[in-house]
C-alpha cells in the first residue's frame, strides 16, 4: 500500500512541547540548496532548544548548519533506507528519541519511493515531508517554500527568513574582491571573457582580485581564459567550511547563480550575483548587502560587461562610503 503522509498537522496545530530528545532534518541537494535551508534549521533550533539536532546530508555541507549530530546520506547505513531491510540498528538507535523528523525531498512525498518513506517513518513517526523544488507558478523565495513543513504546525517562523552561517570567530575583513566565473551548470555561466574584462577593470581601480574555483569547475579550469585560470591569486577551498572563511574575509563577491554566492551572502559578504535562466525571485542569495543583476531575456550571453561593471562600481562605492562595516 502507498505510504500516506498526513495532510493535517501532526502537531495538532499547536506548538509541540520541547521535552528534549532529538529533532532531525533530511536534506540532500547542492551547496546552495542547503544554505537556503538554514532558516528552517534555525527554526528547529529556536523552537526545540532542549532537543539534539540531527542533520542528514553531505557532512561537509551540513557543517555550515552549526552544532549538530551529522549523518552522511551517502554512507552505507543510510543507503539501506531505500531497501526493504528497514533502518539499520545504528540508525534506529540514533533516532530512538526523535520527536520530529523533517525530510525535504525533490517532488515531495508523492515523488519519493514508498519504501524510503516507510523507513523514514520507522525512524520517527512524527514526520513531515516537504518539497525541495518550486511549485508551478511560484514567485516567493525558496526559503519560504522550504519552511512549509513547519508553517501550519504552530511553530514560530520568521517573517523574512534569511540564511546565516555562524562562524566561531569572524575573519578580519580585507580588501580582496572574489570572482567566481564557474557554476555547476554551464547554462548559468556569464561568458568567461566578460569576467576577464571585469577582472582587468577591478585591477585598474586598485583592487586585489582573487579567482575562486569550486569542485564543479576545478576539473575544467583549463577551459577558462589564462587571465582567469592563471590569475595571481587562486582560491581552491578544500571544504564548504573553508569556502565560508574565505568569503567572510572578502570585501566583495561577484559570481554566477551558484552555491558560493549563497554562502557569501550568508556570512555577510556583500555580493553581486549574475542570473540568467533561473528566477532570482526564487533563488537569489539573501544577505545584508546582496545584489542581483538579471540578464536580458534570461540569457547571460546578452548581459553586457558594462552593465556588470556599473553595478560593481556602485556597490563598491557604497561600501567605501560607509563608515560602518556590513553587519552579519
What residue ranges belong to the model's regions?
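Catalytic machinery of carbohydrate-active enzymes
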Residues: 1-328
Amino acid at each position: 500500500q502507498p505510504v500516506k503522509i498526513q495532510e493535517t498537522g501532526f502537531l495538532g496545530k499547536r506548538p509541540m512541547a520541547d521535552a528534549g530528545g532529538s529533532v532531525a532534518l533530511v536534506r540532500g541537494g547542492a551547496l546552495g540548496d542547503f544554505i537556503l535551508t538554514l532558516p528552517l534549521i534555525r527554526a528547529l533550533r529556536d523552537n526545540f532548544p532542549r532537543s539534539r539536532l540531527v542533520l542528514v546530508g553531505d557532512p561537509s555541507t551540513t557543517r555550515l548548519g552549526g552544532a549538530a549530530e551529522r549523518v552522511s546520506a551517502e554512507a552505507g547505513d543510510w543507503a539501506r533506507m531505500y531497501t526493504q531491510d528497514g533502518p539499520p540498528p545504528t540508525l534506529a538507535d540514533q533516532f530512538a528519541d526523535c520527536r520530529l523528523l523533517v525530510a525535504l525531498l525533490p517532488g515531495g512525498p508523492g515523488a519519493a519511493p514508498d519504501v524510503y518513506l516507510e523507513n523514514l517513518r520507522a525512524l520517527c513517526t512524527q514526520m513531515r515531508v516537504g518539497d525541495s523544488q518550486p511549485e508551478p507558478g511560484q514567485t516567493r523565495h525558496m526559503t519560504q517554500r522550504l519552511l512549509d513543513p513547519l508553517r501550519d504546525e504552530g511553530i514560530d517562523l520568521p517573517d523574512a527568513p534569511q540564511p546565516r552561517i555562524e562562524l566561531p570567530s569572524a575573519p578580519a575583513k580585507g580588501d580582496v574582491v572574489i570572482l567566481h566565473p564557474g557554476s555547476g551548470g554551464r547554462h548559468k555561466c556569464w561568458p568567461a571573457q566578460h569576467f576577464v574584462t571585469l577582472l582587468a577593470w577591478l585591477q585598474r581601480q586598485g583592487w586585489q582580485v582573487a579567482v575562486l574555483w569550486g569542485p564543479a569547475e576545478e576539473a575544467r579550469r583549463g577551459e577558462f581564459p589564462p587571465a582567469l585560470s592563471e590569475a595571481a591569486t587562486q582560491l581552491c577551498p578544500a571544504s564548504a567550511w573553508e569556502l565560508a572563511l574565505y568569503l567572510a574575509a572578502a570585501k566583495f563577491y561577484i559570481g554566477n547563480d551558484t552555491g558560493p554566492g549563497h554562502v557569501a551572502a550568508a556570512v555577510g559578504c556583500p555580493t553581486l550575483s549574475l542570473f540568467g535562466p533561473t528566477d532570482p525571485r526564487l533563488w537569489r542569495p539573501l544577505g545584508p548587502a546582496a545584489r542581483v543583476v538579471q540578464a536580458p531575456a534570461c540569457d547571460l550571453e546578452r548581459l553586457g560587461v558594462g552593465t556588470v561593471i556599473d553595478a560593481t562600481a556602485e556597490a563598491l562605492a557604497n561600501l567605501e562610503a560607509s563608515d560602518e562595516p556590513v553587519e552579519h
